[in-house]
Amino acid sequence: MSKMENNTVNKAGSTGVELNLNDGTQRYQVTKKDLKKTADRYNFMACNIFNYESQMGPAVAWAMAPVLRKIYKKDEEYKEALNNHFNYFNSTTVMSSMILGATLAIEEKDGIEAKETVQSLKTSLMGPFAGVGDTLVWVLWPTIMGSISGY
């Protein structure tokens, strides 16, 4: 299957890549700049829009909204994808950007049909990533810094 690339300029003014598929449809290809922007938005807001019902879910939706808009051109699909990311999410902030990148890859490849897969992936990864992230950020780092400062 051959794919042709067209450089396009979206509403925000940044250059993205549209893939022309053999069936005549176009699909947005997520760039490294999109992933970095999503991670930065999430890291900035993860604890600011925290609530006890969905924990960090609103931060996930807010961080992914610009890229989801590029992936989903139709308003109905965009709203459905965005609502899917408002569900419960709780993991260490530093590690969560990897989970968001993986979910964006699935959204990009499979579209709205994979919304249950996206939610399952987030649910299955947030626990292990929280365990590793909490150990690194809240146990290992303070122990090393305390040892150095006490020396």
What would you call each of these model-derived segments?
Residues M1-A114:
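Soluble N-terminal domains of membrane-associated systems
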